[in-house]
């Protein structure tokens, strides 16, 4: 008797479409809100060095909640977790809209984002199969970057028109994301019945950290993605100061347009990675990571807007090619060991720890009066060296493994 094969689930299923739409509007709100709030604190005459603290409150929420959000994502239906997280984001946006402390409001958005991240990536492994996971990650990253592109531009352009109008549009975006969350079919919890004692949850989380760190592929993903996002968020704030210094432009829109060029490039790079890189060939992405640092140095020395646009598109393409395979690799390794939700929570701890460290250093050197050009050059050189060291470390580890297997 011949066995019947189960029909393949199409990549763009109802569930996937709902997840992608929710992700777009949620990420749109995050990015538009950042630039609208930056314009607000500029209007309120906060010092330049305080700008990174807006993002630092956001990422601190990720770090503090890291031991708990992975278990939350795996203990409940991930669609419901995403809905709850977007509700928190909406509350944070409304707090800023009504004149509340902008740092507190954006930190509340960070709490929502911390809960949202493990669920949004973890759900991909539940609604796709096999090789579709890399393609699904490509769609997720493309949606995210499209949201960064449009959200960043909208935040800056609308803030030049009316800051509180821009903030209100951010709240509307979170409301649309909530509506899309309601279209995600209710899925079974991946790991129900886990204990809810904080000490046990923290112990379980750090156990997951150890398990993933001992896995060579997971370790590569954790280190690579942490370095990338730490550098990426620092570049975003660097552009805010670089534009008036290098280009002589003082509006809110130009830094957001330049950030949008990075987003355009990441869409291209993510698409290329989905076609050219598989889970078995993830290390092909490392040269792109090294070149990111090189391009940052070249970009920092520019004084022409068009060349800046071109270089940032290239920078984004390299970033997309670098990050998408690493994300897919961690989800695959995590799903097989500690659960996709816990794996993404561990990843968030690494990424946001790197962001907090780099933003803190950036704020310090700005306060010390270091030139923004010198900051950009040093930033690019250090990133390229870090990726080069990671690359050499992997080559040496591979040689050791071959020598051990030959004995």
Curated annotation (Swiss-Prot):
Its main location: membrane. The chain crosses the membrane at residues 18-38, 53-73, 91-111, 139-159, 163-183, 229-249, 257-277, 286-306, 310-330, 343-365, 375-395. Keywords: Cell inner membrane, Cell membrane, Lipid transport, Membrane, Transmembrane, Transmembrane helix, Transport. It is found in: Cell inner membrane. Pfam families: MFS_1. One of its GO terms (cellular component) is plasma membrane. The keyword Transferase does not apply. Coiled coil: none annotated. It is a multi-pass membrane protein. GO terms for molecular function: lysophospholipid:sodium symporter activity. PANTHER family: MACROLIDE-EFFLUX PROTEIN, MAJOR FACILITATOR SUPERFAMILY (MFS) PROFILE DOMAIN-CONTAINING PROTEIN. Belongs to the major facilitator superfamily. LplT (TC 2.A.1.42) family. Catalyzes the facilitated diffusion of 2-acyl-glycero-3-phosphoethanolamine (2-acyl-GPE) into the cell. NCBIfam families: PRK11195.1 (NF008397). This is Lysophospholipid transporter LplT. It comes from Pectobacterium carotovorum subsp. carotovorum (strain PC1). The gene is lplT.
């Amino acid at each position: 008797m011949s066995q019947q094969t189960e029909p393949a689930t199409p990549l763009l299923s109802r569930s996937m479409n709902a997840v992608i739409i929710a992700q777009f509007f949620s990420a749109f709100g995050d990015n538009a809100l950042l630039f609208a709030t930056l314009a607000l604190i500029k209007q309120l005459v906060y010092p330049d060095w305080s700008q990174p603290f807006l993002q630092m409150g956001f990422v601190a929420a990720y770090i503090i909640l890291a031991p708990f959000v992975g278990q939350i994502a795996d203990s409940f239906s991930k669609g419901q977790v995403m809905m709850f997280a977007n509700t928190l984001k909406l509350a944070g946006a409304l707090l800023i809209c009504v004149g509340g402390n902008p740092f507190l409001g954006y930190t509340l958005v960070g709490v929502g984002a911390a809960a949202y991240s493990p669920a949004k990536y973890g759900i991909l492994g539940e609604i796709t199969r096999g090789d579709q996971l890399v393609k699904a990650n490509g769609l997720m990253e493309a949606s995210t970057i499209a949201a960064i592109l449009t959200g960043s531009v909208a935040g800056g352009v609308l803030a030049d028109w009316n800051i509180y109008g821009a903030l209100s549009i951010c709240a509307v975006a979170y409301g649309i994301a909530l509506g899309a969350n309601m279209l995600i079919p209710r899925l079974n919890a991946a790991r129900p019945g886990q204990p809810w004692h904080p000490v046990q949850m923290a112990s379980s989380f750090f156990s997951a950290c150890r398990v993933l760190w001992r896995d060579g592929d997971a370790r590569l993903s954790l280190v690579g993605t942490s370095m990338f996002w730490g550098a990426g968020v620092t570049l975003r704030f660097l552009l805010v100061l670089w534009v008036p210094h290098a280009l002589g432009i003082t509006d809110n829109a130009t830094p957001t347009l330049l950030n949008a060029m990075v987003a355009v490039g990441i869409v291209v790079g993510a698409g290329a990675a989905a076609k050219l890189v598989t889970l078995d060939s993830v290390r092909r992405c490392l040269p792109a990571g090294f070149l990111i640092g090189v391009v940052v140095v070249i970009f920092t020395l520019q004084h022409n807007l068009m060349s800046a646009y071109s270089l940032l598109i290239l920078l984004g393409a390299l970033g997309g090619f670098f990050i998408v395979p690493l994300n897919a690799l961690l989800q695959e390794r995590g799903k097989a060991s500690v659960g996709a939700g816990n794996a993404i929570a561990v990843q968030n701890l690494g990424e946001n720890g790197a962001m907090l460290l780099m933003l803190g250093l950036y704020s310090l050197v700005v306060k010390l009066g270091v030139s923004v050009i010198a900051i950009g050059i040093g930033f690019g050189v250090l990133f390229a060296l870090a990726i080069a060291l990671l690359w050499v470390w992997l080559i040496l580890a591979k040689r050791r493994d071959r020598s051990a297997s030959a004995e």
